[in-house]
Amino acid sequence: MALLASLLILPVAGAHAAGSLGVAKWEAGTCTGNETQVKSCEYTSPHSAFYTQAAGHPPWGLTGFELTTSGAAPTGSPLKRLRVDVPPGLAADPQALAVCAPSQFEANTCPADTKAGFVQLKAYVEIPLAAQALTLEGNVYNLPQEAGHPLMFGIDVKGIPPLVKDVHLVLEGHVSYAHEDVLAARGVPSGDFHEWFEINNIPTTVAVEALGIPLTDAPLKTIESKLFFNGHAGKEGKENFLTMPSNCKAPSTSYLELETYPPVEKASQPTTPPVSVDGCENPNLPFKPTATIAPETSQYDSPDGITTDVHVPQFEKSNQLNTADIADAHVTLPEGLTLNPSAVNGLQACTQSQLHKGSAAPVECPAASKIGTVNIETDLPPRSLSGNVYLGQEDGTAAIEGLPHPFLIFIDAESVYDVSVRLEGQAFPNAATGQLEVSFLGNPQLPFSDLTLTLNGGPRAPLANPLSCGAASTSFAFSAYTGASFGGATPFTVSGCPETTPFALSQATTNSAPNAGAYTDYTFNLERGDGNQYLGKVSTVLPAGLVGEIPKVTLCGAAQAQAGSCTAASQIGTATAYVGAGSEPYPFSGPVFLTGPYQGAPYGLSIPIHAAAGPFDLGNVVTHATIGVDPHSGRVIVTTTDLPSIFKGVPLRLRKVTVTVHRSGNFLFNPTNCGPLATNTTLTSTAGATQSLASPFAVANCNALPFKPNFSAATSASTDPKTLKANGAALRVNLLQNAHEANIHSVVAELPKSLPSRLTTLQKACPEATYAASPSSCPEGSKVGSATVTTPVLPQPLKGPAYLVSHGGAAFPDLDLLLEGDNGVRVILESNTDIKGGITKSTFASIPDVPVSSFVLELPSGPNSALTAVGALCTQTLTMPTTITAQSGTVVKVATPIAVSGCTGKGKGKTRIKILSKKIKNNKLVLRVQTFAAGRVSVKNRNLKTTFKKFAKAGKFTIKVPLSRKGVKGQRAHKLSFKARVGFLPKSKAESVSVAFTNVGFKHKAKKKGKKKR
């Protein structure tokens, strides 16, 4: 790439002339015609004399100026330096010509195919005794490019034999890629990639000789100078030495700067031709660039080193119009070829200040910000522009935040010829799909045939291939400086996919404490290999008995949970997500917070993971989960339905998830069942595939856990036959258990014959289908009681009704307890009912492995009572054989006494104590009694000394009551006959005070008389 416009000026005089340096005329433009016609091309020429077609190859490019004169000689000091800056887009292509070697140039033997143009000038030569204005001509040749100079031309000004010898000048050309303060000071644009040309250290004399003998070095001054570049010069098939700008809206202004030897004077002047570039709307003006993407590997769902090539066809013949320069470029990558989070490993960013775009300062981007390489195929010369691609960061920003802001891509292509192309691109990912659109806007008018950008490959590649195989496409849209646009698509193929994309993940779990019932930390791991379908939903059922004490945690509020801004008081663990394709996914971690109700579940999780790594800070990715409870097994179910697969346009390609539940002060505790357990998970992919996983879970030393449940029961029933028939009997069952014992697995209880099931109520049982659909729709008569369960894992007790539920094929309906608690936690305890010989047996065979502080079952009397009574309960000894089995396997069997309430007051049938036997011996009444609860027994009568006896538990006891004086006297007289009052005061206020009476009388005297008669 190089630009036309070089002004030639011949060496000027060594003697100082009167007056100041001045430019009388300065013109630059592109002209038509042949070599003879172009010599007369000036601003005053008809417009038809100028070539104006945008992106065309002009026949000629010329620059010319005249200096002010005083008499026949120019004014001012001799020129030391001159510079010409031409319009952006006006390009000279040195590759169109052969190269004249420096030795050939010095010997005036440059080949004809190296000629780039000619010069024409008028000079004042101070030949001794014959100073005069001479008309001189010469040729311009293409010289080899040198380091720091992409354009080099030699100007051979022919002398006038035999007096004036030839003059050789070197015209150095360059590209203005950086801002230059000195140009800005005189109003000349810089950094816009226009070409400029300069002659330095202009000689001040020319050799004069006669008959081949050197006579002197004569000063000479240029009066007029014109340089003509042959725009159609070039080797066969490449006759495009000059190319016009593509912008019809920008002025075609060129700038001239002159500088003299001391005393230094400078002159600067712009010039704009009378006609501007036009023809941008020419339908024959070609503009069909393309973009193709080639993968380093075509393996699906893997990191890939992508090579993107933007190809711009060049039309190099003189009778052709060249491709217009690209102003804006948009390339949309194939769907599925997206950003790869693994790239963040060790990645840094290059700031705009470090790129130094528009500056000649060296690029200072960190090595760790390099994400690829770039090559630009231009004419300065081919394959000379190459460099690096960097991840960019906007100045003044603390981090790269992602959408709605684009990701920045910096390109730095350098050449040994001191040309630097520094571009800032933008990558916009689609927020929903991650599809990338890469844009480079306001590109320089720099002719190129190919721009090849290759991103790094390997496990940390910035891009990763699609998960699915098949043909995809790269779409592109380019706009030219002419205003034209062109778009299209090129194919992109991904291969290596199996017939069906697999969905086979692995799961593992660990717990920190092995002992049953111990507080523990629990870690859940889920891993997905490359090539598997992406994870969309996770539903995990924890091992039975692995539960946490929710009252210990402050639940996070809904607003804070949604925002991921919960406090530490709500944290119960940590989570780590490994994201990105390849062998080096990047881990991002964050806290796990316990929340209140979420999406209809009683509890939830808020898991904010801060997506900050390296130069990136995309903010929090907040994942939510529901926490439910299986109503039958009590197992905790954690379900994530909104598992993110993309965030701010970056597909996560989730590889591994690790969640650890741990909390200072203890939260989670182990099951108390040492049998084989498991964590069961159901996975659903984003494509709808499912997978079931199970990982074993076990605890030990269950036998070391104590198991001492306290079971009690009480009943009541009316003694009035009519009332009893109408309302039946009531039953209350209580169970108490200390903390840190083995949890209950099953309970089997048998009611005595005196408390049979009530047939009329059994017949009102709720049908199984109705109960399953909606218990509230069950017949009123099927609701026979209520239950309350207090557990340390919930802040509030579980409460709910007790239903009789009939099952098809079962002989008797079951008793089901429908318990609900905090935030809608529901637990269903099901018992199996069997009735034989009037004895009702209820079996709760599978109670959840959850600690229970207390359990109360109330089966009240009433029209729909579950039980009725046979006989006067207060006069009977009622027991309930009970078998309680622990989760650890320990079995407790007890004959649970059933206390009878409502037996206090006067009259018969008022006892919670039963008299088993009585006798008088040694002046004492010996009573054998049975109590049905702990309490105090009192025995009173005037014939007895009042006696009190305490018993710590229910049972059968012997009480010896001394006779009073009256009693002893009556015994001696054989006239002892009285009714003893036996009272019972229970220890528990829940029990009833009872009284029993027994008649005491003796007939010893009669018996003795009978024996004597015999």
Segments from the language model and where they lie:
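Sec-dependent, cleavable N-terminal signal peptides
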Residues: M1-A17
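Residue-level detector of buried hydrophobic side-chain packing
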Residues: L3, L82, A329, V538, ...
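Ser/Thr/Pro/Gly-rich, low-complexity intrinsically disordered stalk/linker tracts of secreted
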Residues: H16-K908, V1000, K1007, K1011-R1014
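Short proline/glycine-enriched turn/loop motifs at strand-loop junctions of beta-rich domains
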Residues: N532, E741, Q930-R936
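Short proline/glycine- and polar residue-rich coil/turn motifs
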Residues: C566, K949-F957
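Surface-exposed, proline-enriched loop/turn segments that connect beta strands in immunoglobulin-like
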Residues: I913-L916
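C-terminal tail/sorting-segment detector
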Residues: G983-F1002
